[in-house]
């Protein structure tokens, strides 16, 4: 078919060179370097050397920077991420630090609560030397005021992500960031103490590109109402912020909102606020966690109008204001639902049967802390949820019969987590191995025995995310260093305690499931 006659392949020049220079043939004396001190990296381009550095850990990169002046220069010019222990004593060293690291685009400044942080003057120097910053984190920088934030914003106009925690500046500093950083996309504020009662409202310019807002443990956080109501915003997450938030969500407009994700946790919001959220016709993800004033009526108003809802998390906090009535509305209107988490919600056979029958795209389901869910309800799910892939059940009145029903039904089920269900015995594990060899199962004794998941499952499903991070030290692309062994031990303790917390376990499980699916789809 027109092919040339076969002939012996010519040796590859690259393979030949590698063979000639391999360690077993290399002899420094034969090539004229009797002392053996020849630098074989001298002929490597700087870009190639920098690429090699990217595969090293933070500690190895620091040690490599001491090898030669060239390595020091290459390492400094190619570190784009830097984390500093932002104590006040760092001020005289800032010029030297940024002379070496002159290409930083992601900067973290962290100070522990027992020390004085860097001041407005130091932050101004940082903004002058790192004008190309796109991501900044401020943690515990209590000496920075509104004036410091304003000067920083004027010099760092390319900033895209800003995260501040345990700082004392107020609304003026935040407004300055929003005014000068026109391309800011993500704003995260935690424990900002400068938002007093007379604080000026947060203003967003018409040309702003803000896409995500995260507010946590704020006093008078309602001053951010204009941000929540802006039409460009995609994601809102509000956790443990004081005051009533109904008015904020009422400002969402008449269906012109672009919000696709809303997460509310331990917040004073009622059905009035949910009525406002229902105006977000593009909403795809809704988390209602420990909001005791929300009822079936508010939930029904959201699901009736938000036809694109794909992920729904409800933590009823055992106040029993959300039950079958609200879940029946979910079954009727949320036909695109893919992920459902019910914690402390007394769902019955009627509502679960309706959800299993109508929500044909449901892939991830978690039922926790309910006294009304037994073998009959699980059997109904097993029979009707033909697309279910991952299922987590915790603290419910099911037995081996319900677990066996899941194995016999749900043909696409790949992961099953059963926790704190006292009527489920270990014998069902062996039964599952025989019937569903590919099914990944996690049960109570997996943690006590130190075993991850049955049949070689993914250990990441059992991991718990620790919110509080230990303060890091100077670091590079290899990751953020950690300073202070005491806080590291506290983080480990929180991780262990997190494995015993049902709600955190379920939230982590669903988060890992979603991430693994996103990775596999790519």
UniProtKB/Swiss-Prot annotation:
LRR repeats by residue range: 115-140, 141-166, 169-191, 266-290, 291-316, 319-344, 348-369, 370-393, 395-420, 421-447
One GO molecular-function entry: ubiquitin-protein transferase activity
Taxonomic superkingdom: Eukaryota
GO cellular component labels: cytoplasm
Keywords: Leucine-rich repeat, Repeat
PANTHER family xrefs: F-BOX_LRR-REPEAT PROTEIN 16 (PTHR13318:SF262), PARTNER OF PAIRED, ISOFORM B-RELATED (PTHR13318)
Protein name as catalogued: F-box/LRR-repeat protein 16
Organism: Arabidopsis thaliana (Mouse-ear cress)
Lineage: Eukaryota, Viridiplantae, Streptophyta, Embryophyta, Tracheophyta
Protein encoded by which gene: FBL16
